[in-house]
Amino acid sequence: MSMVYLIRPLKLLVIFVATSCVSLPTMAFEPLNTDDAGTIGKNVNQIEQYFYVLHNNVAGNPGGEASPGEEFRGIGNAKAFPLTYTYGLSESTEMSLATTYYSTPRGSYAPFANNILGLKWRFMGDGGSGFGMAIKPMITLPASTSQQVQGLGLAKTNYKLHYMLSYYWDSFQVHTNISYARNPYNKNYPISGSYAPNQTNIVSGSIAPVWIVNSWLKLALDIGSSIDTLPNSGAVNDYGMVAAIFSINKNIDIGLSYLQSGTTPSNAVSGKGITSDRSEIGVTWRF
């Protein structure tokens, strides 16, 4: 893990992302939080297996506006292996199944949580040039009450609708996301020991400009914010991330990232008063 923690000192939040060759369909942007409007293509399979180390300073905080499936609402440290399988139903649609195995924390509950079903539809563009738009509804299956108590999920079905807008140039890309999440939970049980009201109606936005260095390396910035839509509620999280993904060949990418989040953008960037931080490394395989 020493290679991952080399990224921690960086305060200017610049993301290094490498994926497949530019001429190929755009693939999912793991480990970025911001997704792109591209799809993997008909009959293509994709597996994303990652490992992250996360520290939360605030109970109930969802891991710094976490990537879908990587939410951790407990306080303290977590170590987990998020896994996502994606299958291309057509050139413009894909379905995904995701789960996360937690090695830390452990207890008298199943270590698998954040079980998510997703369907992505690109309704504008070819996913590789010019404008592209896509939507992705997602359903997170209920966690057990024991998992909710530890912050490994919420003990009710959660829903999210994700909108993606991308623009692709030859050497530059911009991806923006807007989403709404409905996150009910079992109020008879705490979330990581806290009975304080959890954010249940979340609107999120993010942007990730991407600089294409060559066919195996991209550089990007990923920043975002989430706001509770309830009256008198402020920002839930602002985040910034650094990452690097190296394309071994056209079908295999190795990525690593570092994320900081805070209750204000300046906290997220400076690292002062951060609510959480996450280091992540993993591989994406298409076949």
Spans of features found by a protein language model:
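Short, Lys/Arg-enriched N-terminal segments with co-localized hydrophobic residues
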Residues: 1-2, 27
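Bacterial N-terminal signal peptides that target proteins for export
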Residues: 2-14
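Repetitive helical segments and hydrophobic/amphipathic motifs
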Residues: 17-20, 129
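N-terminal signal peptide c-region/cleavage motif recognized by signal peptidases
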Residues: 23-25
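Transmembrane beta-barrel domains of Gram-negative outer membranes and organellar outer membranes
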Residues: 27-287
